[in-house]
Design a protein with these regions (language model features):
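N-proximal low-complexity "stem/linker" segments adjacent to membrane-targeting elements
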Residues: 1-25
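Short aromatic/hydrophobic "clamp" motif used to bind/position activated sugar donors
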Residues: 83
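Glycine-rich, basic loop-to-helix element that forms the pyrophosphate-binding segment
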Residues: 62-78
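Local beta-strand N-terminus motif with an aromatic residue
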Residues: 2-3, 31, 80
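A broad helix-preferring feature
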Residues: 60, 86-89
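Acidic donor-binding segment of Leloir-type glycosyltransferases
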Residues: 20-61
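Conserved short acidic donor-positioning loop in nucleotide-sugar-dependent glycosyltransferases
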Residues: 11, 23, 38-40, 65, ...
Length: 90
């Protein structure tokens, strides 16, 4: 895997839905998506599951620790040589 798109998220399932939808229409497909839920009370797991057949996607949920540690958590679990970090509201 050459590229990993890491998406830290906290209580933003609608934004994650829009972001994942935009990734499905990319012509380049050589990337994985790593969504890391940072202790959300409004989870986006259902949204992520809807894209499992169209994206190479992984979902992780962890206790809230803030955006920096959440990005690092995603990076540690990614397989790409290059990391692209996109907040859910990009």
């Amino acid at each position: 895997m050459r590229y990993s798109v890491i998406i830290p998220v906290y209580n933003r399932p609608d934004e994650v839905d829009e972001l994942l939808q935009s990734l499905t229409v990319q012509h380049f497909k050589g990337f994985e998506v790593v969504v890391v839920e940072d202790g959300s009370s409004i989870p986006c797991k259902g949204v992520v599951d809807r894209y499992a057949d169209r994206l190479n996607i992984k979902y992780f949920s962890k206790p809230n620790s803030g955006p920096g540690q959440t990005r690092n958590y995603g990076a540690e679990r990614s397989e790409g040589e290059y990391l692209i970090i996109l907040d859910s509201d990009v």
